[in-house]
Amino acid sequence: MAFVARQTFEYQMPSTWYPGHMNKTLKRLKNLTSSNDIFVEVRDARIPLTSRNYVMEDFLNKKNRIIVYNKCDLADTFHTKAKVSKHRIQNLAQQFQNVECWFKETSTPEKSAFITPYVSKAPYFAKELLRLIRTLVDQASANGRVYVYFVGMPNTGKSSILNSLRNVALRKSKSAIVGNYPGVTKRISEIVRLFNDMDVYMLDTPGIMTPSITKPEDMLKLSLVGCVKEGIVHPVTVVDYLLFHLNRIDPSLYSKWSLPTNDVDEFLQNTAYKARKLTKGGFDENFVSNYVIQQYRIGRLGRFQLDTIDKNELLIRLHNEQNKKNAK
């Protein structure tokens, strides 16, 4: 009998992950920033709508903002598909908010081995972004200090982009701590000078989640790409959600480990055996689940978007977001 993938995914999720330091950071940003300041908002291209923080929208819409969709190479297998997705995101962004959108691929040595030829040179991206920031600074203020804040959800790559800009602009080693775990930055960081000839400074900020999630499935997406602290959603549930997507896209993406299956337990046991991830105690589902999740995050289980990118989906999200705001 031919394999038939699940068409729906049943789940019960935590409402959100919103530690106290996130709310403190948001309040501080609102109180400290001026009209001259620039905000670089970093989103994950695999979840371009889900990684949009509706709590910050009213605040950021009044600011000079650049949106960077990071990790584009992990969002699509084929470059032509990536271009289509970029155009869709760009068009949606231009329709609903007056911002500049940029797209960046991953650039770490570990990841680049598996995603060539889609990786763009980090220095090139940095130079172009620096040129845009200079333009915005000139437009914002003829004199006076300007701050460039890097904001977004946890683990979207804010610190890495900040360091890349600093390295290119000043030829200095990186300053912000970079980690693959959400919550590495817990407070607004030290002030870092951006240009030698301009009074412009950069600040890294902690990743900020939303106090509540507009769609329950979003917690699964955020957990899968690494925006949510490990353990908030059980790793087996995260893998089950990944398996759901893999089966709908192409079950052969995991053929090196298992035959097509909708059973996450069967999938994990087969993976543990084929990938040689059995521990001394035998089969450890959490250990194998975390291994599978990491393989997905570096592009070894296909590269695809988890969000549906269309106008209707964004309108639904905007409606749900407004309901959340009105309920306060």
Curated annotation (Swiss-Prot):
Gene Ontology CC annotation, any one: mitochondrial matrix
Signal peptide interval: none
Membrane topology: Peripheral membrane protein
Binding site for GTP: 70-73, 155-160, 207
GO terms of biological process kind: mitochondrial translation
SUPFAM superfamilies: P-loop containing nucleoside triphosphate hydrolases
Residues covered by the CP-type G domain: 23-211
Main location: mitochondrion
Protein location: Mitochondrion inner membrane
One of the Pfam families matching this protein, by short name: MMR_HSR1
GO MF term (any one): GTP binding
PANTHER family assigned to the protein according to its UniProt record, in alphabetical order: MITOCHONDRIAL RIBOSOME-ASSOCIATED GTPASE 1
Protein known as: Mitochondrial GTPase 1
Designated gene of the protein: mtg1
